[in-house]
């Protein structure tokens, strides 16, 4: 990579994983990264990780913007800062996030959501001023959300960067940028699981394992994990799962299996972490009549599906969740502290490691039955 010598930040040429067309694999090539504008920071990435949402981005979801650089989990060191940035400096280690928290808008003041109006979850592929900081020659390259961590250098709005405690390992901090935190937060911030309650988690990837750990931390008395891969049993148990069900090969639906396991009562909370639309109905019907809550936190290639009316009419609740309701400034430090105190077995998440040039090998690893998280080392 090269950087022109100048007292002020200048354009950097570096390597990044670029997706040019929906469905095509990322290609590692040279890009140009502009200096940060007044309220932005430029980050030298140290570590990133793969999330299944990145696979969706490679396939044109949620918006088909190409060429684009995916990636929304990672950790890096601030290389330069804009003139108006006062809370961050060169050399700080930070997590680039896809949500911000101004603390002043209606949503932030409510304390009931993490979806900030001033620093929102963005789908335009551009930064807040409506432009990109990345290009290949004259070709503009789109960001993924507000970050694009599959690049050696990135530029983000400073409000989307959270400092990393040096006691947290880089891979662990990367995992907290999305998947695991999404599951954990959904049991704590978005839906506060009551102590002694019963929980099911559909899908035991990083999001599902986060939900299992969160339910355990909240004091759930029974945590049933469901996955079609028997190898996920051991992972689930490491995070606090009390029972495991593999529905593959059964002639019964997931809701039938859960209701059978609960004497027909169902469960207090059911977390749908697979992103398969048909399983939302299974999650709803697995929850208790009149009392149960189904929480939707998975995302997949299918973006719509039918929801049955009668099960909802019977007093059940459905809740959607982004990043588990976790607010970057107010809540994330609590989760980081849990990692520091070894309250969460984060080492269980990391199963594979690749370099940026091996990004497509990382996608192949995601298909392995024993894979949970793939780390990218820069």
From Swiss-Prot:
SMART domains: PKS_ER. Zn(2+) 1 binds at residues 51, 72, 178. Expressed in the leaf internal phloem-associated parenchyma (IPAP) inside the mesophyll. It is found in: Nucleus; Cytoplasm, Cytosol. Binds 2 Zn(2+) ions per subunit. Gene3D superfamilies: Medium-chain alcohol dehydrogenases, catalytic domain, NAD(P)-binding Rossmann-like Domain. Component of the seco-iridoid and derivatives monoterpenoid indole alkaloids (MIAs, e.g. vincristine, quinine, and strychnine) biosynthesis pathway. Catalyzes two successive and reversible oxidation steps for the formation of 8-oxogeranial from 8-hydroxygeraniol. Active with 8-OH-geraniol, 8-OH-geranial and 8-oxogeraniol in the presence of NAD(+). This is 8-hydroxygeraniol oxidoreductase. It comes from Catharanthus roseus (Madagascar periwinkle).
